[in-house]
Amino acid sequence: MNAADESLGNVLLVGLGAVAIQVALDLRRHGAGRLGALNHPGRRSQRIAEALARGACLQLEGQGQHRWLSGNAALDVFHQDPAELRDDWQTLVLCVPADSYLDVVRGLPWERLGGVRTLLLVSAFIGANLLVRSALPAGCQATVLSLSSYYAATKVIDETQPLRALTKAVKRRVYLGSSRPDCPARETWRRVLAGSGVEVVPLATPEAAEGRNVTTYVHSPFFLGEFALARILSEQGPPGFMYKLYPEGPITPGAIGAMRRLWCELSELLRRMGAEPLNLLRFLNDDNYPVHETMLPRAAIDGFAEAGAERQEYLLFVRYAALLVDPFSPADEQGRHFDFSAVPFRRVSRDEDGLWRLPRVPLEDYRKLALIVALAAHFDLAMPQARSLLASYENAVSRFIDCQGASQCHPSLYPIDSRPAADAIYRQWCSTC
């Protein structure tokens, strides 16, 4: 472990799931001061506390070519109650679902967190930085940083062992925006993530970074549609696969068309907020999963934004067809490559109280898109494609609630009113213009 980085100081991880375990390992490798975690009280937190009391530490296993990421990290302190926090922390890292940022920030005892200099949002959506800043108390001078998305694919291996996680993939590149463009924390986090082989590209504004959250462009058209929801909300039949072509998965010409139209709507929102939109195909290929140039020539990728709608949809369809298998995996004896797209949908399940709950995909995607649509209304944008996807989700979930009975469903299944949060984002944006 390196010497402590004074620009980080003591770091508190807010939320202690798979993401936090990866971040903790990166911080320990880089060199932070004290490392603590806060997790909301509940059965899972109790299991964490019991494991820590037995002397357990955070354990990360890297899979395949990422095996070198494996390691352990000890926590100096673990809290289940925000009231227990003291003014010991200089950096807060929000490792919670993005749709809970506002509630989490409002629930922190800021009167005892006067030393906080930096807040990092690990997977921010458009407007998240402004939303968090709107919730900070008057006089708080903390810099808020937005990562475009979480930089790895990490999951807890076994819920009975909540301190063990597996990282099976790492992004090549993520983007970082700051509420203070000249803050040294941007360079600090660039070095932290470089330890896992991730390039961090600083952008001029938080919104520019947030506009490069890949799930906003991909999850919404694929997983808020009829095919995906029918599988997610059903206990019977095959689960379906998230990234396969119909009839095995949700990818159809219609879903690709929805992706292109949503990209156009999000691009206009970014422009009105003063951020540069992205070339969607270049972003998907260069920053996420590339395909062979035989399938997508470089000129087609670079010229995507200037192409006509029909050509754009054709190129996007070709990309997803090319990723049905991992195009860079070695072929087996039969000449077959790794079945890259065979990621089954997670389905609704009952929680420990016996209530039906949705998995994070599509619940978080719905909530994120609903907030973006409410924000867009302040900029006189109708976003018909986004609204159509929201309606698809709401109708499917409403039918599920009617079938199962309201008393059997967790409140999180019901639609939320995103307007108050959108109002707060817009007011904060206006105050910074």
Swiss-Prot record:
Gene Ontology MF annotations: oxidoreductase activity
Active site, renumbered: H219 (proton donor/acceptor)
Primary residence: membrane
Subcellular location: Cell membrane
A Pfam family that the UniProt record links to this protein: Staph_opine_DH
Top EC class for this record: oxidoreductase
Triggers of expression: Is part of the operon cntOLMI that is negatively regulated by zinc level through the Zur repressor, which leads to transcriptional activation of this operon under zinc depletion.
InterPro entries named among the record's database cross-references: NAD(P)-bd_dom_sf, Opine_metallophore_DH
Iron-sulfur is among the record's keywords: no
General function of this protein: Catalyzes the NADH-dependent reductive condensation of alpha-ketoglutarate to the intermediate formed by the adjacently encoded enzyme CntL, namely (2S)-2-amino-4-{[(1S)-1-carboxy-2-(1H-imidazol-4-yl)ethyl]amino}butanoate, leading to the production of pseudopaline. This is the last step in the biosynthesis of the metallophore pseudopaline, which is involved in the acquisition of nickel and zinc, and thus enables bacterial growth inside the host, where metal access is limited. Therefore, this enzyme probably contributes to Pseudomonas virulence.
Family: Belongs to the staphylopine dehydrogenase family.
Listed name of the protein: Pseudopaline synthase
Originating organism: Pseudomonas aeruginosa (strain UCBPP-PA14)
Gene encoding the protein: cntM
